[in-house]
Structure formats: C-alpha cells, structure tokens
Amino acid sequence: MGNTKLANPAPLGLMGFGMTTILLNLHNVGYFALDGIILAMGIFYGGIAQIFAGLLEYKKGNTFGLTAFTSYGSFWLTLVAILLMPKLGLTDAPNAQFLGVYLGLWGVFTLFMFFGTLKGARVLQFVFFSLTVLFALLAIGNIAGNAAIIHFAGWIGLICGASAIYLAMGEVLNEQFGRTVLPIGESH
C-alpha cells in the first residue's frame, strides 16, 4: 500500500493551461470574440482542472507543481471573474491600467517560477519563459493602451500554449511507451 505509484498529474495541468491559453490568445490576435467558449474553458479546464492537478502534485510532494498549477488555475478563475462580473452588473468594467498591473504581477510571479524550471526539461523552461514574456507584453499593452502590443502578445501566447500541450503529450506518450516518443529536453 505504501509503494503505490502515483500518476503524473502534470499533463492534466499542462493541457488545461495550454488549451485555455491558446483559446484566449486566438482572441488576442483577433480571430475570435471573447465569448462563452473561452470563459467556460477558463473556469473548468484552465481553472478547476489545473487546481486539481496542483493538489495532486501536493500529494506527490512536488512544491513547484503545487504552486504552479494551483496558482495558474486561480489565475484563470480570477480572470474569468474580472471579465464576467461587469457583465453581471456586479462591478464596473476593469480599468485597463489596473488590469495591466494585475497581469504584471503575474509576470513577476512567472519569472520567479521560470527560475525554478532551470534544472528541469527544456520544454518546461520554454513554457515558463514564453509565459513570462506573454504576461509582460500584456501588462505593457494594457497599461499603455496599445492594442498592437496586445495583438503581438497573442502570438506569443499561441506559441506558449502550444508548447505546454507539446510538453503534456510528451510526458504522457513517453511514459506510456517507456521511451522518448516526443523529446522534451529532459535534464539528467
């Protein structure tokens, strides 16, 4: 009973993060309006599934995974609330500069988390580096009121989300086949 191997919850968290990030950034680059698809993904897959993955990382004793997944899951839930509450008449629309500060704080958090990846897989490093850049650009774009920066950030977000999906599938397939199917740049 004490030797039970626990499943790796990281692919669940990475998929929740990656898919939701791609959908939101398809909006940021101008392909789709901000609608119920993005908001639902933000609540359930980006939010709740990532928090669940983080709690499973806690069970495994992984402080980094716990901190990353529960924090970014909470990010998605707060972002959805920020976007939905004005539509429900609960608050005014968010001030763009204050939204930029919110995103900037997430960028600082992500930069510190990036440093925590430096002994990990190269793809994980890329996910956190590109996410740091994404948050920085979104913060600057909102604070400056510059739609072009937000649009450019959207392209970074698409790359970031795709890299998270690649890492998730790499972890699943590599474990499933017992060999490297998708290289993720594992450190040894």
UniProtKB/Swiss-Prot annotation:
Gene Ontology annotations of biological process type: acetate transmembrane transport; succinate transmembrane transport
Family classification: Belongs to the acetate uptake transporter (AceTr) (TC 2.A.96) family.
Spans through the membrane: 14-34, 36-56, 64-84, 98-118, 123-143, 149-169
Regulation: Transport is inhibited by the protonophore CCCP.
Keyword field: Cell inner membrane, Cell membrane, Ion transport, Membrane, Symport, Transmembrane, Transmembrane helix, Transport
Activity sensitivity to pH: Optimum pH is 6.0.
Membrane topology: Multi-pass membrane protein
Protein's name in the database: Succinate-acetate/proton symporter SatP
One Gene Ontology term, aspect cellular component: plasma membrane
Function field: Uptake of acetate and succinate. Transport is energetically dependent on the protonmotive force.
GO molecular function, one term: acetate:proton symporter activity
InterPro entries: Gpr1/Fun34/SatP-like (IPR000791), GPR1_FUN34_YAAH (IPR047622), SatP (IPR047623)
Domain of life: Bacteria
Side Periplasmic, residues: 35, 85-97, 144-148
Gene: satP
Residues on Cytoplasmic side: 1-13, 57-63, 119-122, 170-188
Compartment list: Cell inner membrane
Consequence of gene disruption: Mutant shows a partial reduction in acetate uptake.
